[in-house]
Amino acid sequence: MANTRSAKKRALVAAKRTARNKMVKSSLRTAIRKFREALGTENAPILLNRAFSALDRAASKGVIHKNTAARKKARLAKALAKATAAQAVAAANE
């Protein structure tokens, strides 16, 4: 347990920030999961934008590093492009 007043305050602040960061990360994971579940549907581009927004928000708040956000955004966009291309090929073969 913290002994000094400043150490007690730092412990409280750390607990608050941890709770806030957990909330942001949870909503980020939810947005990404919903996008991945919607791949191949007409809602995928809309959910991709929501995932991008969540990633940008988390990066701007310092919850995740900006390069991590950029990497995840690139991978999500690549997944959408791959799914869209697969749909186009399937439609052309029919």
UniProtKB/Swiss-Prot annotation:
Pfam families in the cross-refs: Ribosomal_S20p (PF01649)
Coiled coil: none
GO BP: any one term: translation
Entry keyword set: Ribonucleoprotein, Ribosomal protein, RNA-binding, rRNA-binding
Highest rank taxon of the organism: Bacteria
Alphabetized GO MF terms: small ribosomal subunit rRNA binding; structural constituent of ribosome
One GO location term (cellular component): small ribosomal subunit
Family named by the database record: Belongs to the bacterial ribosomal protein bS20 family.
Function: Binds directly to 16S ribosomal RNA.
Entries under HAMAP family matching the protein: Ribosomal_bS20
Name this polypeptide is given: Small ribosomal subunit protein bS20
Native species: Symbiobacterium thermophilum (strain DSM 24528 / JCM 14929 / IAM 14863 / T)
